[in-house]
Design a protein with these regions (language model features):
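Glycine-rich phosphate-binding loops that contact phosphosugars or nucleotide phosphates
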Residues: 21-22, 30-174, 180
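Alpha-helix boundary recognition
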Residues: 6, 30, 57, 193-194
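Short, surface-exposed connector motifs at secondary-structure boundaries
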Residues: 33-37, 195-200
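Short, glycine/acidic-enriched capping/hinge loops at junctions between secondary-structure elements
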Residues: 16-17, 48-52, 213-215
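Acidic catalytic cores of enzymes that act on phosphate-bearing nucleotides/polynucleotides
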Residues: 61, 196-215
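Generic recognition of flexible, low-complexity loop/linker segments
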Residues: 25-27, 75, 188-191
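Active-site/ligand-binding-proximal alpha/beta "capping" segment
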Residues: 171-194
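An N-terminal, well-structured beta->alpha segment
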Residues: 1-35, 183
Length: 215
């Protein structure tokens, strides 16, 4: 995981060089004139989706909804997704429910976009457009590198969609800022985190939730 984190600055620099692709996807969104954006993702990719939701709503003024894959996978219900943009975020691009959701959204009239690490994955192939994050092979379960790069390309997309020059310039500084973060002394933070964990554990014992959490 530490090695993959150290790979983030150069990977971000490579990602920022793909501005033409991001601009083309932003142009397709603009031409689609969507009424709503639907975002699909699980785990850490779902957290990236929350980040992208705030960008869409605060920067572009577009309403965003979170996808519920079980509507398609369990209840077998298709939705009217005309005038919608459907964005699926996935590191592996192989979760069956995300693939089914993307296929259903595309069939139902949405402009479908995959923010994905593996461009040959089923999720990428199910979508009309793909934004590759270029994280490469990851071994750490946390997938920190692809999560960070997915957030970076999310920022790029919104900057291009809204023609936000100030945001674009801030994003250009990220490789340098990430590199600087790797040189910082994080020992004080580790001590604070350790103390916070102890306080949390004692709080669980005090209010009686510890045994329940372990059950």
């Amino acid at each position: 995981m530490a090695r993959e984190i150290r790979e983030i600055p150069p990977a971000t620099e490579r990602l920022l060089a793909e501005h033409d692709l991001v601009a083309a996807v932003a142009d397709r969104i603009r031409k689609a004139e969507p009424r709503v954006v639907v975002i699909s993702g699980r785990g850490s990719s779902g957290n990236v989706g929350t980040f992208l939701r705030y960008l869409f709503e605060t920067r572009a003024g577009l309403l965003v909804s979170t996808s519920a894959p079980s509507v398609v996978t369990t209840y077998r219900q298709s939705l009217d997704m005309r005038d919608a943009v459907f964005i699926v975020i996935s590191q592996s691009g192989r979760c069956p429910d995300l693939v089914m959701g993307a296929r259903s959204a595309r069939k139902s009239g949405a402009l479908t976009i995959a923010i994905v690490n593996d461009v040959t994955s089923p999720v990428a192939l199910a979508c009309e457009l793909t934004l590759p994050v270029g994280a490469g092979l990851e071994h750490a379960v946390a997938a920190t590198k692809s999560v960070v790069l997915s957030m970076v390309i999310s920022g790029q997309l919104i900057a291009a969609l809204t023609s936000d020059h100030a945001l674009r310039e801030k994003i250009k500084q990220l490789p340098q800022r990430f590199s600087h973060a790797l040189t910082c002394d994080w020992s004080a933070w580790r001590q604070l985190r350790s103390s916070a964990c102890r306080v949390r554990n004692w709080a669980r014992v005090w209010i009686g939730t510890g045994a329940r959490d372990r059950a």
